[in-house]
Amino acid sequence: MTERTLVLIKPDGIERQLIGEIISRIERKGLTIAALQLRTVSAELASQHYAEHEGKPFFGSLLEFITSGPVVAAIVEGTRAIAAVRQLAGGTDPVQAAAPGTIRGDFALETQFNLVHGSDSAESAQREIALWFPGA
């Protein structure tokens, strides 16, 4: 089943010049980049994107991090795109949960600075795409 998902390459991925590597892995998986933009994230967009984490102890530092530098936002399409992107990304904790061969397993060292975000469900993907790409 063809799906759409949101992928973010976070500020640490931009700073470490991993955009090409990450996009290449997505494309080699057979997925399509339907839209792509480099942007600065406002506090408002960050709060909306991470709304489910509001009130948690790490919420403030999460917003500070995602707004600390440019982000690449992409709409990725393809068969089972949501699961495929999450498999490529690897576990949220790059040391304990991300397998070698995944983006996080190969390149990340900390849970917060884990390089990429991928929507976790069809509902999340729809909501997140509407936030980052209004009208898409």
Swiss-Prot record:
The gene is ndkA. The keyword Cytoplasm applies. Keywords: ATP-binding, Cytoplasm, Kinase, Magnesium, Metal-binding, Nucleotide metabolism, Nucleotide-binding, Transferase. The keyword Nucleotide-binding applies. Its main location: cytoplasm. Pfam families: NDK. SMART domains: NDK. Gene3D superfamilies: Nucleoside diphosphate kinase-like domain. ATP binds at residues 10, 58, 86, 92, 104, 114. One of its GO terms (cellular component) is cytosol. Major role in the synthesis of nucleoside triphosphates other than ATP. The ATP gamma phosphate is transferred to the NDP beta phosphate via a ping-pong mechanism, using a phosphorylated active-site intermediate. Belongs to the NDK family. It is an enzyme of class 2 (transferase). Homohexamer. It is found in: Cytoplasm. Its cofactor is Mg(2+). This is Nucleoside diphosphate kinase. NCBIfam families: PRK00668.1. SUPFAM superfamilies: Nucleoside diphosphate kinase, NDK. The active site is at residue 117. InterPro entries: NDK-like_dom, NDK-like_dom_sf, Nucleoside_diP_kinase.
